[in-house]
């Protein structure tokens, strides 16, 4: 079976798979770089990427920022400049700094959940980075798109929809989300 490439703005993943961001040492440069090298979208998790840094206990935030930047650059290198994203939870205390770190270190996209990323368009403004919220309902994306359109005159580049079996697309979920996806696409094209 031939799959169509995934296009997000000017980014193209030959294989339409976005690897999920799994925290604390799972989704780092090795996994994300390998996925992107094979043609998918590799995703690094911003949840404690610096846990192996020698000063992690004393300087947690600095260790995490340093490690995240290094993991992004390393994943880009492993993947031969494939599509690399970062999953940043809205609930993280230093959310804005994580977004800035992604932009400064060459991540291609940010995927953000664990809350509604209401400030994300403002934080990425002026950069080339693509962004997406993680939502579980049409209502959530309608609220975000309405807010973003009013405040920033924009909406996200794509949307990640997570159902009760997050990260897994089953036939039953495809039916349920088909209408939702269509409505999201219509909204995106009208902005």
Feature locations, PLM:
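Active-site entrance/lid segments in N-terminal catalytic domains of soluble metabolic enzymes
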Residues: 1-191
């Amino acid at each position: 079976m031939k799959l169509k490439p995934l296009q997000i703005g000017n980014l193209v993943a030959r294989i339409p798979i976005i690897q999920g961001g799994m925290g604390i040492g799972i989704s780092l440069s090795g996994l994300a770089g390998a996925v992107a090298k094979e043609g998918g979208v590799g995703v690094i998790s911003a949840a404690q990427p610096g846990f192996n840094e020698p000063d992690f206990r004393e300087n947690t935030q600095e260790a995490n920022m340093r490690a995240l930047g290094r993991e992004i650059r390393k994943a880009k290198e492993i993947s031969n400049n494939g599509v690399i994203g970062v999953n940043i939870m809205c609930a993280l205390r230093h959310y804005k700094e994580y977004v800035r770190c992604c932009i400064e270190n060459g991540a291609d996209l940010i995927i953000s959940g664990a809350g509604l990323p209401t400030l994300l368009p403002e934080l990425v403004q002026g950069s080339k980075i693509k962004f997406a919220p993680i939502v579980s309902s049409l209502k959530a994306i309608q609220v975000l798109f309405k807010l973003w359109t009013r405040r920033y005159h924009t909406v996200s580049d794509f949307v990640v929809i997570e159902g009760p079996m997050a990260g897994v697309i089953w036939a039953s979920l495809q039916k349920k989300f088909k209408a939702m996806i269509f409505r999201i696409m219509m909204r995106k094209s009208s902005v």
